Design a protein with these regions (language model features):
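Short, aromatic-rich membrane-interface segments at the entry and exit
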Residues: 34-42
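Short acidic, gly/pro-rich beta-turn/loop elements at beta-sheet edges
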Residues: 16, 127, 139-141
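N-terminal membrane-targeting/pre-transmembrane regions
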Residues: 1-33, 151
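Hydrophobic, well-ordered secondary-structure segments
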Residues: 20-21, 47, 62, 116-120, ...
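Non-transmembrane, membrane-adjacent beta-strand/coil modules in membrane-associated proteins
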Residues: 71-130
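Pocket-edge structural micro-motifs
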Residues: 6, 119, 133
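Cytosol-/stroma-facing membrane-proximal "stalk/adaptor" domains immediately downstream
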Residues: 132-151
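Conserved beta-hairpin
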Residues: 44-84
Length: 151
């Protein structure tokens, strides 16, 4: 049973923008060179842009069974300290000037809000996790609820 699950999928607008960029760049090559090269350019650009967007969409944040999973990383909820839902400005500070290089970050350029999760395990070299999310209040509440039942 999942108490929280969110796929960090790329917004539709980004896919539309990607298609427009591929068409424009491919057209530039076609106008300059003609022949088979533009077809190859369209294909290569589409594959690269598509692979990047699909890769970004693959990340899942999940709170279930006493564990927080963010993409491939896991954190037992009994090692969780303070949990804070961050607005855009707070998240920007922790992504930028106030970032700790040892922190675990799962960020996406199209998600501006995040959740700060303090790692309470003294043996861990990771001071906190910063997870981008569309629903920071829900994620923070799910972590706190699950942490209370585990801890």
């Amino acid at each position: 049973m999942h108490s929280y699950r969110e796929r960090l999928s790329v917004p539709v607008g980004w896919w539309v923008l990607a298609v427009v960029c591929v068409v424009l760049l491919g057209t530039e090559v076609w106008a300059g060179l003609g022949g088979f090269i533009p077809v190859l350019t369209y294909a290569v650009l589409a594959l690269i842009v598509g692979a990047v967007l699909v890769n970004w969409s693959a990340a899942v944040i999940e709170v279930t069974g006493g564990t927080l999973r963010a993409a491939r990383a896991t954190l037992p909820l009994d090692q969780v300290g303070k949990v804070v839902a961050l607005d855009e400005a707070q998240a920007a500070r922790l992504r930028g000037p106030r970032a700790d290089p040892a922190a675990h970050l799962l960020l996406r350029p199209y998600l501006k809000r995040a959740v700060y999760i303090e790692v309470a395990d003294p043996a861990s070299k990771v001071p906190y996790w910063l997870l981008a999310t569309r629903r920071p209040a829900e994620l923070a509440a799910a972590i706190q609820r699950s942490h209370e039942t585990v801890g």
